[in-house]
Amino acid sequence: VRMPALIQLAAKMVEAGNQRGGMIVVRMVPEGAYRAEALSAVSAALGRRNIDAAVPLFRLAEEEIDRIEDQSTRFRAITYLVARETEIGRLKDAFETAFKITEDVPRAEALLGMGRVLIDQGKLPEALVLKDYIPYIGMRAQIMAAVALGRGLENDPEGASALLAEALDPTGFPTLPEYVPDALDAVLSAQIKVGLESADQAIFSRARDLSEVLTTDLAKVRALVQVAIAEARRGRIEDAQKTISAAYRIAFENKGDQGFNSALLAISLAQLAAGDL
């Protein structure tokens, strides 16, 4: 707990104009990943007042990262740096920094983090560019769903649904099951809010297919519940009931598992949405 608090304190001091005090706090942070994060944080804080002045500090952060021997720790520090560079609009630098990660999945995670910052800033076109560099459905779909939501809110439901359908298209790369629930939630929520009803069947079907890649049966149940709730909210009650039945069968095949009760609770929420309870 202490290190994140020190990092936040250093950044707040620099943002308030006390650069000297902030750097004193940075030097209290141990060398390695925490020091790299502290330097990244104060760089971004300084960059919010003077973007050019942040560059030397970002370079110090990169030098600190280069000295981290453990690869996964180094990748996490790079991911943090990418987000901070993105926050202050140094997008070219952030993109290039992400590609210092030499493994595909951690690099995609860094780009997803970059995309989330851009989405929070309302820079949707810039965020959408990143989908071409993130080959994993569960990650890229989160960005594409946010952009689709933006399109729908700008009265382009057709464009929104087209992007949501594309978000669930196979990419030829392995599907990372741990990212699928968030992706399904983002895509289905966006489709319900702003998508064309005529696109529902295709998108819901793709979402149902995607649930099959999940590694445990109870995770599949929760994914099917997400689909069923979306179907029910669209008034596709018969489809929702079929999806609920499929989820119910899978759940009871695993009634001895630890997550069985939570799976039943999830199914009951879908039944409520479909008017069955």
Can you annotate each of these PLM segments?
Residues 1-277:
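Non-catalytic tandem-repeat scaffold regions and their flanking low-complexity/translocation tails
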